Amino acid sequence: MNAITCTNLSFSYGKVKVIDDVSFNVRDGESVGVIGPNGGGKSTLLKLFLGLESPMSGELKVLGEVAGKSRRRIGYVPQAMRFDPLYPISVIEIVLMGRLDRLGFGAYSKECRAAAENALEKVHLEDFKNRTFSELSGGERQRVMIARALATEPDLLLMDEPTANIDLSAEEHFIEALAGLRKDMSIVLVSHDLELVSELTDSALCVNQHVHRHSLPLGGETIREIYSGRRRIEHDRKTRHQQGDHSVCDHD
């Protein structure tokens, strides 16, 4: 079976075509990276998978259902999540929020709290459950958002640039937390970081209106073709670390 099936899928914002007649599958249990230039349609694909946007034409099935109807079986990790610093919400409360859509106020039962604590263990933050979100570093916050998604016990995990705002050391913790999850669910990871995609996924979908699947690791010629001469971000984390890029402060 397929976790995602796209057949002749198209989508436009007004007169601007973003996704143009694409067909591809993501198999059950498969981890897939989504790469490509800015504005190519990567985040739009995630919105379509979540049912936040509807295709203009073609067919999209997610977990065997029309996109949107399977929303409660999907975990979603956004690029960043912010909470009002004046409201001291705890880490465990944030993780429990992930179950509200599925269970309503039943999300706060003892059983659900145990599931939330288990999700925090999977991302190595079990000792942080009573801390407030504002106390955490950027990397720790991202791992909390993974735990929040995992607490829903999803069949499909979608992530949108989850390491964009964290530094190298935090990213390593993030990778460690995520690597152990691949066997439990299908994963779609949107990222500009080609090294991250190579480490955590089985193949890559290049999105630039059309979609092309690439095996990993990507060769230099393929990378140049994907980004079409546009200025790319620096993908090599080791080089970034050696150059002393600590522009994003993170104590994770």
Located regions from the model:
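Conserved ABC ATPase signature
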Residues: T132-L136, E140
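Helix-to-loop junction immediately C-terminal to a conserved catalytic motif
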Residues: L50
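Conserved ABC transporter NBD signature motif
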Residues: G58-R72
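Catalytic Walker B motif of ABC-type/P-loop ATPase nucleotide-binding domains
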Residues: L157-E161
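Conserved ABC ATPase "signature" region
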Residues: L96, K110-F128
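The feature captures the beta-strand-to-loop junction immediately N-terminal to the Walker
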Residues: I35-P37
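Conserved beta-strand-loop-alpha-helix hinge in the C-terminal portion
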Residues: V207-H235
